[in-house]
Amino acid sequence: METWKTNLEETKKRYIDWWNHKGIILNMWEHFQKGVKPHADIPAPAPAKDLNQKWFDPQWRAEYLDWYVAHSSLKADILPVANTQLGPGSLAAILGGVFEGGEDTIWIHPDPDFNDEIVFNPEHPNWILHKELLKACKAKANGHYYVGMPDLMEGLDVLAALKGTDKVLLDTVMQPEVLEQQMQQINDIYFKVFDELYDIIREGDEMAFCYFSSWAPGKMSKLQSDISTMISEDDYRRFVQPFIRE
């Protein structure tokens, strides 16, 4: 891998120190282009025809991200990584949630036909889109930058996106045993999905995560639970903590 970042090896060492609770990383959420000398002569693609192409056309996004990284600052510990996100919590879309492209983000709406069954369909178009996007970006990157892992999210947040937050909150009282079972099902699917996407984006064993622009010498994940602000400590320990720990 020959990236456009000239000090990548130094940055890797600082990340390894950081994973071992030493030192700091000087990074940023995304990238900036102002005053940057391009790393390569990569032309920008034609403007997206609409929001669907902007977010859901793998080839267009791969071309855009190739241009974007080539024209972005990679100083300090800023990583050369393509942001392949398909919305926050896109595991919910893989499981049946509905995509909606916005101007600045992707919204994921609940599955209108959700019936409390958590089923992974390997032929679901949203799952196929995830893989096609990563493969297109990996081919375009040609070793010049990492292809980031999308923001799949985990657990209760995924179910809230898939079913609706209000309904999930009611489930903590009305059907807690069913909710626990669903959390385990989501975890099991998460690991399957993550591993398959990791095998697409990995560089050796290394990977990068597009949100928070993080790097690791092996598998890593970002863990969170936004819905935890709306539940009790006891419910957090029952419905969130065990599955994040897993």
Question: Language-model features: where?
Answer:
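Conserved active-site "lid/cap" helical segment
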Residues: 60
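A contiguous, low-structure linker/loop signature
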Residues: 81-116
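Active-site loop segments of alpha/beta catalytic cores
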Residues: 1-51, 63, 68, 75-83, ...
